[in-house]
């Protein structure tokens, strides 16, 4: 089981990413635009850098919904590999069964 503080930190990051998502997209659009002057582009870059670090979606970490484990995570199920296996063996994941041929 992951530390509660780490899991809470990721939840906090998710909230911050949602809060600044529109602003980040707007600034990135200005930076990538060809029609914008160099000065405007430079100002947009400075504003983007002034945003909190945790506002960047790359700082988020996908975690298992049961254990909080950050590695071996399957997005489709929202579980880490070991918990996915346990849930599958118990028949808790619909449509998933152990392979046999």
UniProtKB/Swiss-Prot annotation:
Sample GO molecular function, one term: rRNA binding
Swiss-Prot/TrEMBL GO biological process terms: translation
One cellular component (GO) term of this entry: cytoplasm
Keywords per UniProt: Ribonucleoprotein, Ribosomal protein, RNA-binding, rRNA-binding
RNA-binding in keyword set: yes
PANTHER family: 30S RIBOSOMAL PROTEIN S14, SMALL RIBOSOMAL SUBUNIT PROTEIN US14M
Role this protein plays: Binds 16S rRNA, required for the assembly of 30S particles and may also be responsible for determining the conformation of the 16S rRNA at the A site.
NCBIfam families associated with the record: PRK08881.1
HAMAP family xrefs: Ribosomal_uS14_1
Similarity annotation: Belongs to the universal ribosomal protein uS14 family.
Assembly with partners or alone: Part of the 30S ribosomal subunit. Contacts proteins S3 and S10.
Name the record gives this protein: Small ribosomal subunit protein uS14
Gene name in the database record: rpsN
